[in-house]
């Protein structure tokens, strides 16, 4: 039996989508547990105001699923760091009580 591992990754919107897709695909294909058919999928699947969202899909034998899932998660994260692909910027907003803006107590 076969299973499909689905993973999602984000990066800063300033990155070139083609570059990120190529790195994702290269990382997935480097793992011998990933089956060549159905062909692995690594594509830009969403855009937000701060991020590009990518989906990775790879088929494997059922007995390899969990190890592959966790290993791909780690390897892709490491590959993105090695190639200095930044995570999306995090915006933090705070609300101050009425009349207290800019003060601390």
Report the location of each language-model feature.
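Solvent-exposed, non-transmembrane regulatory segments of membrane-associated proteins
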Residues: 11-15, 21, 25, 29, ...
């Amino acid at each position: 039996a076969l299973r499909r591992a689905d993973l999602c990754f984000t990066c800063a919107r300033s990155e070139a989508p083609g570059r990120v897709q190529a790195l994702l695909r290269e990382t997935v294909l480097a793992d011998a547990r990933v089956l060549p058919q159905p062909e692995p999928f690594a594509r830009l699947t969403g855009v937000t105001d701060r991020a590009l969202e990518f989906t990775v899909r790879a088929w494997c034998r059922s007995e390899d699923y969990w190890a592959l899932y966790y290993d791909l998660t780690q390897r892709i994260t490491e590959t993105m760091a090695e190639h200095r692909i930044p995570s999306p910027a995090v915006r933090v907003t705070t609300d101050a009580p009425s009349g207290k803006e800019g003060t601390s107590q």
